[in-house]
């Protein structure tokens, strides 16, 4: 009788050990599944962040030149910034912002699609065009190889394209002006100049 009891007890212990082992295997499997899923999510997020970072670093704008129109000998009334994109991608100008500060106030300008035009005659003065007013800038297309910048609703420039961002802003002589052309993605184009003490000519190069 005692021998049978001991055998039954050993059998019960063996079954208990087997149950614990199976439970441990199941827990390990669940944990492994969670780790694999987490690793996959992290890899996906890392890839997305890497692509976004590459886009931010490689793309962007360059301000090639800034010109101004003098309404008299001591004040500018119009500014034109010639911009081109960096190598790494295209820039939608309709989502870009221009900021300018003269030291006393900072102004922000957004795109006005009604002030978009192709410049097909180099002999015409750019300042004879109807420019955007208020807190808006317009676009004059100088060079556009694929036609992407010639769409008024969302002019998009890519490598090799050149446009002039046009805006009206009164700037006095001997004034330090700084600003940026900020695209939705990528590095901003930098505007930085000081106006001269007297404007001898109507059209002046500022930067």
Curated annotation (Swiss-Prot):
Q: Its GO biological process terms?
A: archaeal or bacterial-type flagellum-dependent cell motility
InterPro entries assigned: Flagellin/pilin_N_arc, Flagellin_arc
An example of a GO molecular function for this protein is:
structural molecule activity
- Compartments where located: Archaeal flagellum
Disulphide bonds in the chain:
none
Q: Pro-region residues?
A: 1-11
One GO cellular-component annotation of the UniProt record comes to: archaeal-type flagellum
Q: Name the principal localization, coarsely classed.
A: other
Signal peptide as annotated in the record = none
Indicate whether Transcription regulation appears among the record's keywords: no
Q: What does this protein do, in the record's words? A: Flagellin is the subunit protein which polymerizes to form the filaments of archaeal flagella.
Q: Which PANTHER family match?
A: FLAGELLIN B1
Q: Which family does it belong to?
A: Belongs to the archaeal flagellin family.
Write down what this protein is called: Flagellin B3
Task: Look up and give the organism this protein is from.
Answer: Methanococcus vannielii (strain ATCC 35089 / DSM 1224 / JCM 13029 / OCM 148 / SB)
